[in-house]
Amino acid sequence: MRKAEVKRKTKETDIYAELNIDGKGNYDIATGIGFFDHMLSLFAKHGLFDLKVVAKGDLEVDTHHTVEDVGIVLGNAFLKAAGDKKSIKRFSTFYVPMDEALVRVSVDISGRSFLYCDLPLKAERVGNFETENVEEFLRAFAYNFGITLHVELLHGGNSHHIIEATFKALGRALDEALRIDERAEGIPSTKGIL
């Protein structure tokens, strides 16, 4: 099984994560940010990843440091757990509707860090979660995992629905891209490296 454990401690945050890519969607999330916990739970459940995240951050300042640093830790955990990436499918695109919202997420487990994010969010907050931190999380995750990630809102207006569809689609897309293809041999690249 492809598993990882990552710890990261700074003056702003103290984060621990356990990941099993080949899990069943079990999760135990405690970041101190209720809405973010909910999104990470959806991500794990729909990606079928077993995920534990325990984060303590300077929430008296705001949620930015905690959300971004969880993205860093999870990106590192996925990178570590993915191992040599032999025989993975590598690419995936997933669409997820949430009522009026429709979000498309495309991933390439490429070894090249890039984020394209087009998620216009009308609300500044959902609960105590600053919505601008969605992009901060996605950037930290993509850059620390070393993936190309495109996230686009095709239509919708409710910020909660848009963010929820995003995390579900990200989980589904990663599940597909990281799946082992029994027909494939070696690294899925003509370069021989990802």
Swiss-Prot record:
Gene coding for it: hisB
Q: GO molecular function terms here?
A: imidazoleglycerol-phosphate dehydratase activity
Quote the catalytic activity from the record.
Answer: D-erythro-1-(imidazol-4-yl)glycerol 3-phosphate = 3-(imidazol-4-yl)-2-oxopropyl phosphate + H2O
| UniProt pathway annotation | Amino-acid biosynthesis; L-histidine biosynthesis; L-histidine from 5-phospho-alpha-D-ribose 1-diphosphate: step 6/9
PANTHER family of this UniProt entry?
A: IMIDAZOLEGLYCEROL-PHOSPHATE DEHYDRATASE (PTHR23133:SF2), IMIDAZOLEGLYCEROL-PHOSPHATE DEHYDRATASE HIS7 (PTHR23133)
Quick one: a GO cellular component term? Answer: cytoplasm
Q: Name one GO biological process term.
A: L-histidine biosynthetic process
Q: Where is the signal peptide?
A: none
- Originating organism: Thermoanaerobacter sp. (strain X514)
Keywords from UniProt, A to Z, are: Amino-acid biosynthesis, Cytoplasm, Histidine biosynthesis, Lyase
Gene3D superfamilies listed in its UniProt record: Imidazole glycerol phosphate dehydratase, domain 1
What name does UniProt use for this protein? Imidazoleglycerol-phosphate dehydratase
Leading EC class: lyase
Reply yes or no: does the keyword Cytoplasm apply: yes
This entry's Enzyme Commission designation comes to 4.2.1.19
Q: Which SUPFAM superfamilies match?
A: Ribosomal protein S5 domain 2-like
Q: What family is it from?
A: Belongs to the imidazoleglycerol-phosphate dehydratase family.
For this UniProt entry, what is the primary localization, expressed as one broad class?
cytoplasm
Q: Where is the protein found, in the record's own terms?
A: Cytoplasm
